[in-house]
Regions:
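Hydrophobic/aromatic beta-strand patches that form the interior of the parallel beta-sheet core
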Residues: 70-72, 133, 158-160, 322-324
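N-terminal helical capping/dimerization or prosegment-like subdomains
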Residues: 1-81, 243-247, 264, 341-352, ...
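Acidic/histidine-rich catalytic neighborhood of metal-dependent amide-processing enzymes
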Residues: 108-178, 182, 218
């Protein structure tokens, strides 16, 4: 490991992160941070840097189509700053080794980690091609984010998705299926024994969703989880409602497809006339085999493996992927977001060391 070069690149990456924090980049409004990242790669001598919308990616020097390709991907968009911030969310203040600012942790630190790794290995003779893509619209799962460039990339063997995981490696990640459901009844006067109360029918369905256990359980992600997150019915106190709508958040493991989960719910929900409509099948569960050579090496070197209940851009990738990066997901979307500079430095060094050994197998 060239520690002098790595320190230089890490220091420069931290300065880029400070500039990213200074530059608002809420989802769909990342044009200025995309420009910063594009110019940063160009300024470091990267020949092939590309941009589509607010997505920026760079390709290995001397790209060889006969070699497999690894994708490094993270995002540069942020959520809106929480109203409870006590600091300026766009001021990259450093105090006692702590860097504050919106996007510092999610996913600035992880993005800098992957950019620095790409630059460290740039121009070296490796058994793999590398592509680094720092993309937009991750926070809102937007169509103009990473999914808009997947067809512009060469075949990918596996992807490393940068998110704050305390440098642990997520080998599996739950997908999301949102269901809009409507229970049907019959209107009537509340004072009489007429009508069919759609709320009561919905309660039967909701209780079933709450208690149903899917047959297959994942060793990394546990069970499929259904959570009712919204209910709406009725407008007048004396009228039995003929409809009750409810919204369901379903977290899916790699053991099921979206269609399989939808079919099971439709076939087993107590009221067969209840409409169950999926919003999208886009955000799939993701997984990389724990016997994959990279995962086996990481585990042997002491990296902790885990299954993640939250989603990332892995959900739209059609190939094996893992999630890792400096920072802590518990800080994401919180007021006074921060990352430790030591987390970035140690994360970069650990990642470079891991890939050096992987490339040298």
């Amino acid at each position: 490991m060239d520690k002098e070069l790595l320190k230089k690149l890490t220091d420069e990456g931290i300065e880029l992160l400070k500039n990213l924090i200074r530059t608002p980049s809420v989802s769909r409004n990342e044009d200025k941070t995309a420009e910063l990242i594009f110019n940063y790669l160009k300024d470091h001598g990267v020949a092939d840097v590309r941009r589509h919308l607010n997505n920026v990616w760079a390709i290995s020097k001397d790209f060889d189509a006969n070699k497999p390709t690894i994708l490094f991907n993270s995002h540069h968009d942020t959520v809106l700053p929480a109203k409870t911030y006590t600091r300026d969310p766009f001021s990259p203040d450093v105090e006692d080794g702590v860097l504050y600012g919106l996007g510092s942790n999610d996913a600035g630190g992880p993005a800098i980690n992957l950019l620095t790794n790409f630059l460290y290995f740039y121009g070296r003779q490796l058994p793999y091609n590398l592509i680094v893509a720092i993309t937009a619209e991750e926070e809102n799962s937007g169509e103009n984010g990473v999914m808009s460039i997947l067809d512009k990339l060469p075949p990918i063997e596996f992807a490393v998705v940068g998110e704050p995981t305390c440098m642990e490696i997520s080998v599996a990640e739950k997908g999301i299926l949102v269901l809009d459901c409507t229970a049907h009844g019959k209107t009537g006067h509340a004072a009489r024994n007429t009508g069919i109360n759609a709320i009561y029918k919905a309660l039967d369905d909701i209780n079933w969703l709450r208690n149903y256990k899917f047959e297959k359980s994942s060793p990394w992600l546990g069970d499929v989880k259904c959570t009712v997150t919204g209910v709406n019915a009725g407008t007048l106190h004396n009228v039995i409602p003929a409809e009750c709508t409810f919204m369901v958040d379903v977290r899916i493991t790699e053991k099921y497809t979206h269609q399989e989960v939808l079919d099971i719910i439709r076939q087993n929900i107590p009221n067969k006339d209840t409409e169950v409509k999926p919003r999208s099948f886009k955000l799939k569960s993701s997984h990389i085999d724990e016997n994959h050579p990279f995962i086996k090496l990481a585990a042997a070197k002491g990296f902790k493996l885990f299954g993640s209940p939250t989603t990332s851009d892995r959900a739209v990738m059609p190939y094996a992927s893992l999630k890792m990066g400096p920072g802590d997901s518990n800080r994401s979307h919180t007021a006074d977001e921060y990352i430790l500079l030591s987390e970035i430095r140690e994360g970069v060094e650990k990642t470079v060391e891991l890939f050096e050994e992987f490339f040298g197998r």
